[in-house]
Amino acid sequence: MPIIYTTPVSRADGADVVLLPTDLSVATGTPSLTNCTEGTPEAGFPDEIAPQPQDYVFLKRRPSAFYGTGVAELLRLLNRSDLVIGGGATNRGVETSVREAFSMDLDTVVVRECCWGGTPRPTPTASTRR
């Protein structure tokens, strides 16, 4: 099974960060939620889950693992339609990616134990709502 990583990154000058009209930080010009700066250690992965040479790594500039990354194209080339997903910012990146995968008719499983948010408390997500 191929292992695919995505990591959210932005340019150092922030020129590729989107400020939404509903974002309270629009007035200041500083986004409230930022990605890691491309090329810095923060944009990498912890040693425990670091990519191996045979794994695939894609940079992403939006919440989805698919938008503008090449992940969908790789899955087609590998003739894969099943996904197992885990990741950070569960209520943003994981949920967005799962919804897009569903729209692309990909069979998707989210491993709850492999998902995390930015706070010590569990982040309510679609997977925990009833």
What does each model-identified segment do?
Residues Y5-A15, L19-P21:
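Catalytic-core segment of enzymes that process non-peptidic bonds
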Residues M1-P8, V111:
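Short beta-strand segments at enzyme active-site cores
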Residues D16-V18, T22-R130:
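Active-site-adjacent betaalpha module
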